[in-house]
Swiss-Prot record:
GO terms for biological process: phototransduction. The modification N6-(retinylidene)lysine is found at residue 205. The chain crosses the membrane at residues 6-26, 37-57, 74-94, 98-118, 126-146, 167-187, 192-212. Interacts with Htr1. Induction: Expressed constitutively throughout the growth phases, both in presence and absence of white light. The record marks 76 as: Primary proton acceptor. GO terms for molecular function: monoatomic ion channel activity; photoreceptor activity. It comes from Haloarcula marismortui (strain ATCC 43049 / DSM 3752 / JCM 8966 / VKM B-1809). Disulfide bonds: none annotated. SUPFAM superfamilies: Family A G protein-coupled receptor-like (SSF81321). PROSITE patterns: BACTERIAL_OPSIN_1, BACTERIAL_OPSIN_RET. This is Sensory rhodopsin I. It is a multi-pass membrane protein. It is found in: Membrane.
């Protein structure tokens, strides 16, 4: 087993921890109206973990010309990254239209990126440019649109800011890694880029779901207020 496969295996195990964290979150929010929605957070580390197991065995990885397309990496991204930004919008109290809008922009960013990987010449860079435009639009949602919807609740504001900055800062790195790698300018090797992506994916998703667990009082507090009880007690 080569170094990349070992790293992929470790990453998959890390995502199993993320699934467990969501399980603890779900158990701690018994009776909350938001519990069923937040259960969908398990898809983020769950889909990512399954994808990395597939990547360990080379499933879905194909060579097109001189380019290696890791299919499950992009399948993971097209499913989980819209959920990452969608749940940020949910935390902000954004409208369904805004949430679906940011999720669609994210998915289109990933799909254009896949096209840029397999294309060549001018088309490659045109598709990279399209992906970059959608990428910039995500920052517009995170830093301009969603903040307008956040309720005047210090705990909700705190969680929203934490999620927004966590995702926003990490996602600056992804296009830079792509540019440096074999699909872009070729400054970095396939091995280096693969390991970097695995690190970024794990760092982006497992702490993300942990933040929901650590700040679960946001959702427990909402439950107490809706029931008319103004006494705020920590979630179990």
């Amino acid at each position: 087993m080569d170094a990349v496969s070992v790293v992929y295996g470790i990453t998959a195990a890390g995502f199993a921890v993320g699934v467990a964290i969501v399980g603890f979150l779900y158990a701690s929010l018994e009776g909350s109206d938001e519990r069923p929605i937040l259960a969908a957070l398990a898809l983020i580390p769950g889909v990512a973990g399954i994808s990395y197991v597939a990547m360990v065995f080379g499933i879905g990885t194909v060579t097109i010309g001189e380019t290696t397309l890791v299919g499950f990496r992009y399948l993971d991204w097209v499913v989980t990254t819209p959920l990452l930004v969608g749940f940020i919008g949910y935390t902000a109290g954004a409208s369904r239209r805004a949430i679906f809008g940011v999720m669609a922009a994210d998915a289109l960013m990933i799909l254009a990126g896949v096209g840029a990987v397999v294309a060549a010449g001018t088309l490659k860079w045109a598709l990279f440019g399209v992906s970059a435009v959608f990428h910039i639009s995500l920052f517009a949602y995170l830093y301009l649109i969603f903040p307008r919807s956040v309720p005047d609740d210090p705990q909700r504001i705190g969680l929203f800011s934490l999620l927004k900055n966590h995702v926003g800062l990490l996602w600056i790195a992804y296009p830079l890694v792509w540019l440096a790698g074999p699909e872009g300018l070729g400054f970095a090797t396939y091995v280096g880029v693969s390991i970097t992506y695995a690190f970024l994916d794990l760092l982006a998703k497992v702490p993300y779901v942990y933040f929901f667990y650590a700040r679960r009082q946001v959702f427990a507090t909402k439950l107490l207020r809706d029931s008319g009880d103004t006494t705020v007690t920590p979630a179990d």
